[in-house]
């Protein structure tokens, strides 16, 4: 599709839902991550992610907003990928992620991240979409990423950063329930020779001098900075 000026209109972002499943481990809060298989067609090839996937026709009910459809997709995909049946009403919306349209991105996702308490059921991966899983303390997963042991996407890394501020499932769910989800409309920039992903409020987005809301993508040491 083209605009009246002859420019191509980027395709709309694909709605999707993913869920960070939480449990209290021996040393504190833990979250389930699953590893996507290597595939040239998979945007998240080889990365460790939360269970989830795109919204399909059966997830949509007349009158729903996007978050409700994404929630259904997250519940359905979790059951398909890791055999855990979550209750819809127990999921708490955390944030919504969407990259800014750029030509380099053939496909974009508008991804809702939800939080949910783990059930007592055993995790069983489907062996197709998912072949590995593990429970991680959020900060440990971030450290493994810094050391090059596991791959994470920026939204997953940022979510782990938020989870790492909490010591228990009760604590993080209470925090998430009493805040409004944020919309992270991601765009890339450069500062001091380093690539950064910037969001609402940052100097590179809104022009406010010295305002920071960004993720520095420095090899081996991603760093989140926010003062707005």
Question: Where do the PLM segments sit?
Answer:
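N-terminal leader/linker segments that precede catalytic domains of diphosphate-processing enzymes
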Residues: 1-130, 135-228
